[in-house]
């Protein structure tokens, strides 16, 4: 090993000319060497969360349809309808909350406390949605057996 007098800073920049330093390697697609636009990053993150929220919303709507098709004779009819309804309402609330989070300017320090609260609220609501959906899965939603029986 070379025991030269060069100093390297942990997680710091590489000296010019060193392989991997910004001036030695060309910029790759998707990589930038400037600061990150925080508003753009937050908007992308909220858009991704919204898409996942929509997917879960569609899955819960499908589960609600299956439970309603089975009717009140299904053993867990009432608990599942209540849990799925709670999940749907919370998901709509989180979706609206994410829209508000995207609209705020993250560069304004006066709004940081409010944004932090709203972000923590959204995270807490998502956690509650996950727990509710675990219970929905535990009770089980099956398609009606009438659809599987041959018609004569």
From Swiss-Prot:
Keywords of the record: Acetylation, Angiogenesis, Cell adhesion, Cell membrane, Cytolysis, Glycoprotein, Inflammatory response, Membrane, Phosphoprotein, Secreted, Synapse, Transmembrane, Transmembrane helix
Outcome (variant: residue 53 to A): Strongly reduced ability to homooligomerize and mediate plasma membrane rupture (cytolysis)
Spans through the membrane: 79-103, 114-138
Molecular function terms from GO: cell adhesion mediator activity; lipopolysaccharide binding; membrane destabilizing activity
Annotated spans, Helix alpha2: 58-74
Outcome of substituting residue 93 to L: Reduced ability to mediate plasma membrane rupture
Topological domains, Cytoplasmic: 104-113
Resulting phenotype, residue 121 to A: In mutant M5(cyto); decreased ability to mediate plasma membrane rupture
Site residues, Cleavage: 56-57
InterPro entries given in the database record: Ninjurin
Effect of residue 117 to Q: Decreased ability to mediate plasma membrane rupture. In mutant M5(cyto); decreased ability to mediate plasma membrane rupture
Inducing or repressing factors: By nerve injury both in dorsal root ganglion neurons and in Schwann cells.
Region (N-terminal adhesion motif): 26-37
Impact when changing residue 95 to L: Strongly reduced ability to homooligomerize and mediate plasma membrane rupture (cytolysis)
Topology, Extracellular side: 1-78, 139-152
Recorded consequence of changing residue 138 to L: Strongly reduced ability to homooligomerize and mediate plasma membrane rupture (cytolysis)
Modified residues (Phosphoserine): 21, 25
N-acetylmethionine: residues bearing it: 1
Biological process, per Gene Ontology: angiogenesis; cell adhesion; cellular hyperosmotic response; cytolysis; ferroptosis; heterotypic cell-cell adhesion; killing of cells of another organism; leukocyte chemotaxis involved in inflammatory response
Protein name (record): Ninjurin-1
Organism of origin: Homo sapiens
Lineage: Eukaryota, Metazoa, Chordata, Craniata, Vertebrata
